[in-house]
Amino acid sequence: MSDDNAQHSDKENKKGFFSILLSQIFHDEPKNKEELLTLIKYSEENELIDRETGHMLEGVIHITKQKIRDIMIPRPQMITLKLTYSLEQCLDVITKSLHSRFPVMSENENYVEGFLITKDLLPFIKNNTEMFCIKKILRPAIVVPESKHVNHMLKEFRLTKNHMAIVIDEFGVVSGLVTIEDILELIVGNIEDEYDETKKNICQLNQSTFIIKSLTSIKEFNETFNTNFNDEEVDTIGGLVMKKIGHLPIRGEYININQYKFKIHIANNRRIILLQVTIPKK
């Protein structure tokens, strides 16, 4: 009997809290984002929403603070096509990267002429190879400033039905690109497609600099660079870097670990995404 009373009491408490929650939302709205985040946390703790839902709600709130420069893919990491490319050259890049959309650069690579969507190549693959002209099948490129807020970019993507935009700096120079997937990942977490497992965790930029996915295991890092990094509490190189820094770092922040320089290349409000690593000279 006492167990039944306890369960009834728990339900009443949750019902009471839910009433307060509804009152907060529809009558006495939270005064600021901090109060709203606190309300979400309380909702999780009282099992009114699950943790995953809480994460998504927090993500929606946090994107209002972020700008495109915080989440964009930097220009050195952009995979592009050139206006002068033949069909064969385009297909070579496409099959290696497995992306579905590509910025097409001008001959001097200073400007983006437009976007190529891979499905637009299908009519040329079988019978019309000689008729192929990349310029004739380009889609217009959306260009946005680095300072644009992420939530405004998401709204623009939704209204224009576009999935990718070119990012320019204050001087009008291409500095990167942003996709709708980059923004959605801020809300729902990492989105992996069927090809993600084939993409390399470690990519070499030059003799001493590498771009590394933060989810790369410490074991793989050690095997690649012949290092002996080890930590019982974390398994990934991103986790190791964040532990050493002591907080969730922002883009551009760096730390030296055993003569290896780790620079935060891309990060969002929850995690490190990419690291730029400079290895010591031998």
Curated annotation (Swiss-Prot):
Keywords: CBS domain, Cobalt, Magnesium, Repeat, Transport. InterPro entries: CBS_dom, CBS_dom_sf, CorC_N, FAD-bd_PCMH-like_sf, FAD-bd_PCMH_sub2, Ion_transp-like_CBS, Transptr-assoc_dom. One of its GO terms (molecular function) is flavin adenine dinucleotide binding. The keyword Transport applies. It holds the Pfam family CorC_HlyC. SMART domains: CorC_HlyC. Residues 72-131, 137-194 form the CBS domain. The keyword Plastid does not apply. It comes from the Bacteria. GO terms for cellular component: plasma membrane. Plays a role in the transport of magnesium and cobalt ions. Belongs to the UPF0053 family. PANTHER family: HEMOLYSIN-RELATED (PTHR22777), MAGNESIUM AND COBALT EFFLUX PROTEIN CORC (PTHR22777:SF27). This is Magnesium and cobalt efflux protein CorC. The gene is corC.
